Design a protein with these regions (language model features):
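Extracellular jelly-roll beta-sandwich "head" domains, especially the C-terminal globular C1q domain
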Residues: 1-145
Length: 145
């Protein structure tokens, strides 16, 4: 079960809001629920007869970001959001010195999800101001052990 999401449209993501994605290669087994144009992914690990109590997934994110035209240059930060809260353990930060200059950010996190429970993940702008996002790309997959 690996799934890929992206967005070819540039978007302005307000502070404390999620990056929006379209389906590229969605999960065909119904384990990842996502609607086109949404920023929230609901993960539903399958319940099995095994003693497994949790599932671990590797979540990878990459995008180009910039301060919008007319904005004040300063640090840009994004984090994964787990069930609505920004996870401060993995934060991508870059500091453009001029507006509209593109910089790359990347996030990677191993997320543990209890079997039988749903967990929502997203990519959240935690900058404190609006940020332009170009070509966001998200992959959700089981880790290779």
């Amino acid at each position: 079960m690996a799934a890929e999401y992206g967005n070819v449209q540039d978007q302005t993501v307000e502070d404390n809001q999620n990056v929006l994605f379209d389906n590229i290669t969605p999960c065909a087994r119904g384990l990842i629920l996502h609607g086109n144009g949404s920023g929230i992914f609901t993960i539903k690990p399958p319940v099995t007869n095994h003693c497994t109590r949790y599932v671990r997934l590797l979540v990878l994110y990459h995008a180009n970001v910039s301060i919008p035209a007319g904005g004040t240059p300063g640090p840009i930060s994004f984090a994964f959001s787990i069930n609505g809260e920004a996870d401060q353990t993995v934060v991508a930060t870059t500091t453009p010195t001029v507006a509209e200059a593109l910089f790359n950010i990347s996030l990677a996190k191993l997320i543990t999800i209890p079997v039988g429970c749903c967990t929502q993940i997203a990519v959240k702008n935690i900058t404190g101001a609006a940020v332009d996002v170009n070509k966001p790309h998200l992959i959700i997959m089981p880790p290779t052990n």
